[in-house]
Structure formats: C-alpha cells, structure tokens
C-alpha cells in the first residue's frame, strides 16, 4: 500500500520533470527592443526545456541583466538599466524584465585608411568614391550589425573589381559610454591589381570550343571583374549545351606564381604592385547530346495538349530542336537548327514547320521555312527574319483560299524590369515592322507593323497595377492573297479575357477571320496577401477589323488568382465577356514577351 502511494505521488513529479519548469516571462522595453530580448534571452529560449528546473531558472535570472546589456549594445545602447525580478509566490513562477535603454551611442568620427591601390594612369581606382560610399555616417546610431555590414560592403566593392586579394588589416570601434560616441577606424589593403589572361577550357568532349569562345567578352589584359565572370557564366548556362558551368580566375596558377615571387622577395627582390595576368578558367560538364521528352497539358485557349520533342546538340555542328504538338484546336510539327553564337554576338537559326489550326470556323493549313538572325541582351533584343509561307484556308460558309508569301521582318524588344521572372516594376515593349514587298513567291504584297507593351507600377509592396496594350496594322491592295497568319484577331488568355481564343475579328460566312487592324488594352490591379499568393481584378477591351472605323472594342472583366510558382507566375481568371454575356475560365503561365 505504501509503495502504491509513493508511485501515485511520484507520477506527477516525473511528468513535471519531463515537461520542464513552466514559467511566464514579461519583457517591458521600448520599440523593437522587446523583440530583440525575447528572441535571444536564455530566460525565453529555455522556457519549457525538460532540463530546466527552479534552480536553473534562478541562475538565468541572475545572469539575465548581463546578457541583456550585451544584446542592447548591439543596437547602440551601452548604458541601459536592466531590472529582472522573479516572483515564486504563484502557481507558476513569473519573471519580469524591465529595461530603460538610455541614450544610444552615436557615430562620432570615421577614419578610413586605404593602402595599396597601385597607381594606374589609364584608369586609377577612385578611392574618394569608395570612402564616400561608407554608409555609417557621423551622427548615426552605432549598431553592431550596421558596423559589420559597412565593413563587408566596402571590402566587397574592392574585391569584386581589380583587387580580389584585398583585405581589412584593421577594424576598431572605440565606444565611450560617457560621451555616447563611437570612434571608428578601418584600414584596408588592396593587394596587387589583377588582370585576366588567356582563356582555359576544361570539360569539353563533344562540342566545339567556339561555343564557349564566341560568348567570351573578356579579353586578355582586362581588369578583374566578378560581374564579368558571372555574366559569362550565365551566358554559357543559357546555351543548353552544359549541365554545369563554372567560370573563375585560375587562382591555382596565381598561387604558384606568388610562391615564386615570395622566394624572390626573400632574396631581396621587392614585391610587384600588380599580378601577372591570371588565366580565365572555364570548367563545364556537357549535357547529353540527344534528348527525347514527352508532355501533356491543357490550355484554355487551345484545349488539351500532347507533345513529343527531340533535341540533338551536335548534328552537323548545329543544335536541332524539333517537336510535334497536338492540341484540340492546333497541331504543329517543327524542326529548327541553331548555329553557335558568333564572335560578334549573332544567334543564327533556320527551320521549317507544318501547322493546322481550327479556330472559330476557319481551318488553315500552312507549310513554312524560315531563317532568323538575333542579337542583343535581355534588356535590348533585336532580330531580322525571312519566312516563306504557303497556306490553304477553308472557311465555313465560304469558298476555300490559297495564299503564299515571302515577308521579311525586323523586331526589337526593350526590357526594363526589376525581376525578369516575377516583375513588379518596369516595362517591356516590343515592336515589329516588315512585309512582303517584292513580287517573289508572294501572291499579294503587304506591309505589316505591330507594337505591344506591358507596364508594372507598384503602389506598395502588396499592391500592384499592370497595364497592357497591343496594336497592329497591315497595308495591302487586297486582303485576298495575304496569309491569315499575318492578319489580326483578338480574344483569349493574353488578349481580351472573357472571349474564346481569337474569337474577335471579322465575320466571313459562319467564321471569324483576321482583320487588317488590331487594338487591345488591359488594366489589372493585384493584391498580394501572402508573398506567393495574390488576387486580381481586371478590365480588358479590344477588337480586330478591316478598317479603323470598324474597330468596336469588346470588353471583358473579372477576378483572378495569382501564384508565384517555381516555374513562373501562374494566373487563373474568371472573366465575363460583355458582348457574349457569359463567363469564361482563363489560365496562363507568365507573360508572353
């Protein structure tokens, strides 16, 4: 009986020990200091810990003032008053932390000493600009985090251009609690200047070196630049030839030469102010040459989709990309050949395609061959292309037609975005001009121009306005003989929502066909209630017609959901088409240009 009673009494004590001592902590501190203390004091971190008992709590109460003083000093408060009280009278112990931070310590003076930076008459390093960029100015609150960040930023500004061996040789912050001032001194030694040497390539087996060399804009003798290395590496990653790319300065060569230099210094030879040219090392792992992939999907524009693609990275020293795509409203087979980027930065390609479309009562069958030259950067892309297109058209309620054409087109795209994948500020503009102006393989001569743009205007981090527009015009003696590919229609996910894909255009028989002119516009408001989730309201309007006077805009409006997925922004919209008086679901991934 006595043993049973002991077991009953011991059970709650064992449970209590397993859970740890439960107590309350209340922190009274101004501003954000309460969050600082709550996130770092042992009193808070070890609350409920199975190993925490009353004696350990008392010890943490005794050490809490010193710990709080250390934490407050990181925010510039070096003379705080911290009072910690433990009340054990209740069922659960209560700890109260009262903090009076006092006046913060301010930056009193800043002394920056820059050593090295060997004189270069051609392009001397701007030491005054480096000093002026120091962010921790006199009179600011001296915070430990800001102090460390300022030193890292200054060192980073030096090592990423010209002087990758730079280092801080002195870093002192002298704090006077009486005057509430911090005296700062930083000394930085640049080390020797570095320039790039010849390129060294490792890892190539199947593909020609020209793929890498033609993308390299770093010349022997150029000053070291981390940004140049990253840009070169990014270009190589985008080629599709490599599964892994690393572009660096060959420091192994540098170390060997430095060891030789140190041996000379020990013999009384002075150290050089600059390093010998450092080889540019490119290490790659090649992608497999051939790749076959299958895909299925669905589009609210063209319905269910099945596709098979075949890529070959080295056929006649060219890259082949081919695909067969079968959708409910569109079927297409194409093969494109890509030349390696030239030394002048040109990307040349040619190919051919067979395509069948069944859109709004109009069935078109096209065969085309084409060639293209593109150049530029993601900020400014340009291209010129030529295409021979042979097309037959069957229209419900009208006779069939045949057309062929050989147009040339110049296109340019301007981008100024804060983020290329998830833009929240900036714009993209695209314009094209071209046509078939010679009577060669062309049934009807024409001139065609288009312009489209999208603008992102943030109101604040959670609220965003998006404006989109597109216009197009085609000039010809007659529309007959002009392939429908070059005419204009509107409606669909990335056009006027609330209408079917290319539903808006010119009525011909029982079908909707393309017109000579196009005008669409859209305004959208987005609210991001979470970092990756948002909602939208929008209003779209537009139409296509054979004359400007016949463009009577059709409107659509509705609500949508937005999601920032790993592959890009996903948009799901429900739009009401005012002219057709019914709602339609739209789904799109990202934006189209």
Label every PLM stretch briefly.
Residues 123-124, 227-430, 447, 494-498, ...:
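Gram-negative/organellar outer-membrane beta-barrel architecture
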Residues 13-17:
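Sec/Tat signal peptide C-region and signal peptidase I cleavage site
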Residues 105, 120, 160, 165, ...:
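Short beta-strands and strand-coil junctions in structured, solvent-facing domains, enriched
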Residues 1-5:
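Bacterial N-terminal signal peptides that target proteins for export
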